[in-house]
Regions:
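Class I (Rossmann-like) S-adenosyl-L-methionine-dependent methyltransferase catalytic domain
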Residues: 1-36, 77-134
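Local beta-strand N-terminus motif with an aromatic residue
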Residues: 42-43
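A conserved beta-strand element that flanks and buttresses the S-adenosyl-L-methionine
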Residues: 46
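Short catalytic micro-motifs in class I SAM-dependent methyltransferases
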Residues: 49-53
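Short N-terminal helix/helix-N-cap motif within the alpha/beta-hydrolase-1
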Residues: 55-59, 86
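A short glycine-rich, Lys/Arg-flanked "PGG" loop and its adjoining helix->strand segment in the class I
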Residues: 60-72
Length: 134
């Protein structure tokens, strides 16, 4: 079974058309997951280009809550704007210049790893990475 949550009613509608059996909910995850999602256990939880809207402390709390929803052996997969270090983030910010979005709080692996020692990270491009958390 596929479960999901999105802020946009339109995205929920489009996803439901492609996955008619999925259980999808509209809601702002910065206020928490929809109640029915909290009653399930998951083999995998996937978040793509969304968690950068949370502050670093909100990310830590949110990820800790997601970890409690995993089945044994489950994994959280996060694809987002992400960097191995603060230095790499600053280098990218300098390169991008005025195109940089200061309203978004991007992942810095070296800093988040302090809260999640088993976290894994793979840089996928100059500004995107894959984070795995078990």
């Amino acid at each position: 079974m596929i479960y999901g949550q999105d802020f946009s009613d339109r995205m929920i509608e489009l996803a439901q058309e492609k996955m008619p059996n999925a259980k999808l909910f509209q809601g702002d995850f910065s206020n928490g997951l929809a109640e029915p999602l909290l009653k399930q256990k998951y083999d995998a939880i996937i978040a793509t280009y969304s968690l950068h809207h949370l502050t670093d402390s909100q990310k830590v709390n949110f990820l800790k809550n997601l970890l409690m929803l995993l089945n044994e052996g489950g994994c959280i997969y996060i694809g987002d704007v992400a960097f191995k270090s603060r230095e790499a983030l600053e280098k990218c910010r300098d390169t991008v210049g005025e195109g940089w979005d200061d309203d978004e709080i991007y992942f810095v692996y070296d800093e988040l790893k302090l809260h999640f020692p088993t976290m894994q990270f793979e840089q996928m491009s100059d500004c995107a990475g894959l984070i795995l958390l078990k």
